[in-house]
């Protein structure tokens, strides 16, 4: 229990996440499903709600819903159906939204949310998922300065899933990390791009408190904070709403606390406050009714299994395997499995390398740094994972030093050449011929007899200087380890 003055309280948060899916077409028509474009150009009679236009379900839409349900640990129902949700708003052109109210596609899931800070050992909390249902997005209202508003119906009919959690989150940070986990999983399996700036992932958070006041339990009314499109917004809005409800309780203004009272709030980021949009004392009547123009979804066990199996290895399973198989740290695996492309890129390099750990180090320290610096992606690189594996291998074989490897990597970035080609062109390859190195060591010792005597008189730092002279005389080609061993051997003779 948390403390606020003389009160003890618990925070209760549940989330409803709306996620746009990356299907080729819209949910119930053949219009292109792509963000943006000239307003009202990716539309047809169906998504404009014209009389007589009949919807038809996209098979890919259903498949993506199954994939999401499988990835989030849900039971996929063999039977589900569509319903109409009626309300009146300018961007809802039909006057109703096609959704799944009574029988959703997916139910009873759960996700493990890692609550630990970066570089800490994982600390997981299980968040239950009540349901995932299919529904269509609505148009986009554009409020221009002046007396007019415009509506872009390109977004009307875009396929969504709504993921409804149980009220299992007990801090604003948990709510933000839950949303982050959902985004990571759904991006990883390829059903969404998760671009929150474009509205591909939006969160409604239901927040209230259980307060113990002098031994008596009291629950504040639920506030539903709508349409948050960033992790920071979720955390900040829930944090503010908790403090607002505590202050309201302490004000003893209990008129607003009557049974069934509920507020719909918006998050005003500039002011850092939640703002009341509407209040209601009874459940909102959306006049749900079965969608008469769409058949129920009747899915065979075989079809559900085939679609579920196509998802492949999920991020958490991949993390555990990477730690065990490649002996990587928690930080390494968290980063490498943050996106499927990165995980597959690393694994392809690891399988061709003598040191998967060093491959991981190069990818995390050098490759990702370049991508961040240039705001590019792995697909933009002029070389593939096999080149990183080759670079690590030549370092491990002693053909070049780690310092030389940085120069080779720079050439790979600029030209896309193989490490072996860069090494050959620049004459970088180290010489491991012991007779060649011994000859150079003898020459250095003969030319620097005074320095050798200084070492014998106790100036041990001279050994490093002599080593530098050997490397200089060899043009940087002498194998450093062999050279160091021979210098030390010669000094102790």
Curated annotation (Swiss-Prot):
InterPro entries: Asn/Gln-tRNA_amidoTrfase_suB/E (IPR017959), Asn/Gln-tRNA_Trfase_suB/E_cat (IPR006075), Asn/Gln_amidotransferase (IPR018027), Asn/Gln_tRNA_amidoTrase-B-like (IPR003789), GatB (IPR004413), GatB_C_1 (IPR042114), GatB_Yqey_C_2 (IPR023168), Gln-tRNA_amidoTrfase_suB_CS (IPR017958). It catalyses: L-glutamyl-tRNA(Gln) + L-glutamine + ATP + H2O = L-glutaminyl-tRNA(Gln) + L-glutamate + ADP + phosphate + H(+); L-aspartyl-tRNA(Asn) + L-glutamine + ATP + H2O = L-asparaginyl-tRNA(Asn) + L-glutamate + ADP + phosphate + 2 H(+). PROSITE patterns: GATB. GO terms for molecular function: asparaginyl-tRNA synthase (glutamine-hydrolyzing) activity; ATP binding; glutaminyl-tRNA synthase (glutamine-hydrolyzing) activity. Gene3D superfamilies: 1.10.10.410, GatB domain, N-terminal subdomain. Allows the formation of correctly charged Asn-tRNA(Asn) or Gln-tRNA(Gln) through the transamidation of misacylated Asp-tRNA(Asn) or Glu-tRNA(Gln) in organisms which lack either or both of asparaginyl-tRNA or glutaminyl-tRNA synthetases. The reaction takes place in the presence of glutamine and ATP through an activated phospho-Asp-tRNA(Asn) or phospho-Glu-tRNA(Gln). Heterotrimer of A, B and C subunits. This is Aspartyl/glutamyl-tRNA(Asn/Gln) amidotransferase subunit B.
């Amino acid at each position: 229990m948390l403390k606020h003055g003389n009160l003890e309280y618990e925070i209760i948060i549940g989330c409803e996440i709306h996620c746009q899916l990356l299907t080729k077409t819209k949910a119930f028509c053949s219009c292109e499903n792509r963000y943006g474009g000239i307003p009202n150009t990716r539309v047809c009679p169906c998504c404009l709600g014209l009389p007589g236009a009949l919807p038809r379900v996209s098979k890919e839409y259903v498949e993506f819903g199954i994939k999401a349900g499988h990835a989030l640990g849900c039971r996929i129902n063999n039977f589900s159906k569509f319903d109409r949700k009626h309300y009146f708003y300018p961007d809802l052109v039909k006057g109703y939204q096609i959704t799944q109210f009574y029988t959703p596609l997916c139910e009873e899931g759960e996700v493990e949310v890692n609550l630990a800070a970066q570089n800490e050992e994982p600390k997981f909390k299980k968040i239950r998922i009540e349901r995932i249902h299919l529904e269509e997005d609505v148009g986009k209202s554009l409020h221009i300065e002046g007396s007019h508003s415009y509506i872009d119906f390109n977004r009307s009919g875009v396929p969504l899933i709504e993921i409804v959690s149980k009220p299992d989150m007990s801090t604003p940070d948990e709510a933000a990390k839950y949303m982050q986990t959902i985004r990571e999983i759904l991006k990883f399996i390829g059903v969404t791009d998760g671009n929150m700036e474009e509205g591909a992932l939006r969160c409604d958070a239901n927040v209230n408190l259980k307060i113990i006041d002098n031994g008596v339990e009291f629950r504040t009314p639920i506030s539903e904070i709508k349409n948050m499109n960033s992790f920071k917004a979720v955390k900040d809005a829930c944090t503010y709403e908790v403090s607002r409800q505590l202050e309201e309780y302490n004000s003893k203004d209990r008129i607003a606390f009557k049974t069934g009272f509920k507020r719909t709030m918006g998050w005003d980021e500039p002011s850092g406050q939640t703002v009341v949009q509407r209040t209601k004392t009874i459940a909102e009547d959306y006049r749900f009714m079965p969608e008469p123009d769409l058949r129920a979804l009747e899915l065979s066990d075989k079809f559900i299994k085939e679609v579920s199996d196509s998802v492949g290895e999920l991020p958490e399973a991949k993390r555990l395997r990477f730690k065990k198989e490649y002996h990587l740290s928690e930080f390494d695996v968290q980063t490498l499995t943050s996106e499927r492309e990165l995980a597959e890129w690393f694994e392809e390099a690891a399988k061709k390398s003598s040191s998967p750990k060093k491959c991981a180090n190069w990818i995390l320290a050098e490759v990702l740094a370049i991508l961040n610096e240039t705001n590019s992606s792995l697909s933009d690189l002029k070389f593939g994972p096999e080149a990183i594996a080759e670079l690590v291998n030549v370092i491990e074989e002693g053909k070049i030093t780690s310092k030389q490897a940085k120069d080779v990597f720079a050439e790979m970035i600029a030209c896309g050449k193989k490490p072996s080609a860069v090494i050959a062109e620049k004459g970088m390859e180290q010489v491991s011929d012991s007779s060649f190195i011994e000859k150079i060591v003898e020459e250095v010792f003969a030319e620097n007899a005074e320095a050798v005597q200084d070492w014998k008189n106790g100036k041990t730092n001279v050994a490093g200087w002599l080593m530098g002279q050997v490397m200089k005389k060899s043009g940087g080609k002498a194998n450093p380890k062999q050279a160091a061993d021979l210098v030390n051997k010669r000094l102790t003779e």
